[in-house]
A protein has these predicted regions:
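Periplasmic c-type cytochrome electron-transfer domains
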Residues: 1-129
């Protein structure tokens, strides 16, 4: 069960000064708010304690990669340590190169109506994890 062993390893913390603390704080409140809509429902503890699978329709993307999976679904990836991703690969299938693109996707797919500052706050929060 190497998966559970991996969950026991703490994610590295974001370096001091690598994100804006004020914006990250507002982003955290926003992430947990807005009716607890995704991504908060996909990532309630910022990590996924077990297996959480989502259909392409749930997360607003095509089934190109999930169609090759036995379950035909995407796995929720941990959010902690996102700041360490240097080459993109964000989202359930790794399709986005930046966190800005992920936030924009959620804003459009879920019709959240985020203003630019809220988007920036969410990105800073994700960078802080």
């Amino acid at each position: 069960m190497p998966f559970f062993y991996q969950l026991a390893i703490p994610a590295p913390k974001a370096a001091e000064g690598s994100y804006n603390k004020g914006e990250a704080s507002r982003g955290q409140a926003l992430f947990a708010g807005r009716g607890n809509a995704p991504p908060a429902t996909c990532h309630p503890l910022y990590i996924e304690p077990g297996s959480s699978l989502h259909t392409p329709e749930e997360i607003g993307i095509d089934d190109f990669r999930s169609s090759r999976s036995p379950t035909k679904q995407y796995r929720t990836t941990p959010l902690r340590g996102l700041w360490s991703h240097q080459k993109g690969g964000f989202y359930h299938d790794g399709r986005f190169q930046t966190l800005d693109e992920v936030v924009e996707h959620y804003d459009q797919h879920l019709k959240l109506g985020l203003v630019e500052q809220e988007k920036k706050d969410l990105v800073e929060f994700l960078k802080s994890l």
